[in-house]
Structure formats: C-alpha cells, structure tokens
C-alpha cells in the first residue's frame, strides 16, 4: 500500500499535469487508501439526495449536494455546509457520479480556503461504456470499495 505522502504526491502530479485548480486527483482505490491511512482525510459526496438513495452511498462520507434534484439547481449553501462539517485544514476528497460535479466542488472548496481539495476521478459510477451505461468502467462501486444501498 502506498504511503499517504506518496498518494498526496500522486494527486499533486495529476493536478500539475492536467492544470487543475485544486490540490490533486486520485482514482477511487487511491482515495480509499488515503481515507484509511489515518491522516484525517474525509470523503465529501456531492451527489444529490436522490442519487444517494437510489444508487448507493459510501458509509462515513460527508454528504453535501452540489446541485439539488429535481431541477439541478446549484446549492447556494455548499461552502457554508462544508465549513460547518470540517475544519479548513482537512484533506477533502470530493466525489460525484463521474467526476464532473466533484471537480467543480473541489474548485469552489479551494477558493474558499480548503487547500487540500482532491477530486476522485471516475466518481461513484465511473465512465460510460460503449453502450452508454455506467458501472462497467471504473468508479468507486465497480472498483469494489465500500458502499451501501437503501
């Protein structure tokens, strides 16, 4: 298993290569390893309440919607809810369905002073396959990481 330092460095290198506006990016298994490493990192799941209920959730994740459902309206209280949930120095791993909303959330968190914001690439459900379906290529669930369904 990689050390937390090696995982942070891997995340940082990806951020530099992709010119990301936040601290880094990790694959789901790397994110889980960092969460288990006891460095105080927290997973922030930014999917909608509907997604959490119908698709599945990660035990122990902080759940703050980036957009609401229905209507996909931006959560105007996202940063305030994040600030209420964790101290600014906490390493945060942002995850959504596929990595787009979590990219935006990590960007906003960084701008709000959460300097250790990391995007979880592939998200919970992964990328679409050739048939346009998720959960077959990458993602938290496909990788076999902990999750539950209502």
Q: Where are the predicted features?
A:
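Structural scaffold elements adjacent to functional motifs in cytosolic proteins
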Residues: 43-45
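Short, surface-exposed ligand- or partner-binding patches at beta-edge/loop junctions that are enriched
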Residues: 94-95
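Rhodanese-like catalytic fold shared by cysteine-dependent sulfurtransferases
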Residues: 1-40, 49-91, 102-150
